[in-house]
Amino acid sequence: MTDQGIVKINASLRKNVGTGPSRALRLSGEIPAVIYGKGRDSLSISLSNREFVSKYRSAALSTHLIELEIDNKKEYVLMRDVQKHPVTDRIQHVDFQFIDYGTEIKIEVPLIFTNEQKCIGIKRGGVLNILHRTLSIKCSPKAILQNIEIDLSGLTTGHSIHVSDLKLPPEVNVTMKEHNPAIVTISSASTEKEAESNQESTSTTPSSES
């Protein structure tokens, strides 16, 4: 296993759980967290607020394999949930999932759209419609994708890029419910105006009384 795409974070086991101990942890500059997974007992841990927030802001942790060093023992996990304070937006709790290298995992991968300024359809007055900003995939932990780039430069008016048009590694499988959905389209400006006009006329048409 290589270090490519792996984010390393230090952690410590915590014996005391519950509202009181968790509040005390936060006051001391720590974040309470838990690791869970099928067939394994959950682990209650704590993270350095400074270290975790720094890496949380600099990397898309939800699509990175994370190496937690817990009191000199390594565990490989995925971040599954981050709970934040509703007012201060400070991180209150983090959920991780144990990773088994022999089992495929499901994740949502961000889609990155490039060359919008070079897009033929937009240059000709077309309107860009992004229908999906993430892609649901299933793959081994070693094949996790941090993002998927989609080149818009060759997209013309009236055409779309579908899931089947993406060049994905053979070990990555798409798990979206809809079969081969369009991800992005370029429609003509007149089509957009007509659609808006139809919506306005529908919303302003009085309903008939019985």
From Swiss-Prot:
Listed Low complexity bias regions: 198-210
Quaternary data: Part of the 50S ribosomal subunit; part of the 5S rRNA/L5/L18/L25 subcomplex. Contacts the 5S rRNA. Binds to the 5S rRNA independently of L5 and L18.
Name of a matching Pfam family: Ribosomal_L25p
RNA-binding recorded as keyword: yes
Keyword field: Ribonucleoprotein, Ribosomal protein, RNA-binding, rRNA-binding
Keyword RNA-binding on entry: yes
Example of a GO cellular component annotation carried by this entry: cytosolic large ribosomal subunit
Species annotation: Ehrlichia chaffeensis (strain ATCC CRL-10679 / Arkansas)
InterPro entries, per database record: Rbsml_bL25/Gln-tRNA_synth_N, Ribosomal_bL25/Gln-tRNA_synth, Ribosomal_bL25_b-dom, Ribosomal_bL25_C, Ribosomal_bL25_long, Ribosomal_L25_dom, Ribosomal_uL5_bac-type
Family note: Belongs to the bacterial ribosomal protein bL25 family. CTC subfamily.
Chain spans, region Disordered: 186-210
Protein name: Large ribosomal subunit protein bL25
One Gene Ontology term from the biological process aspect of the record: translation
SUPFAM superfamilies (alphabetical): Ribosomal protein L25-like (SSF50715)
Function of the molecule: This is one of the proteins that binds to the 5S RNA in the ribosome where it forms part of the central protuberance.
One GO MF term: structural constituent of ribosome
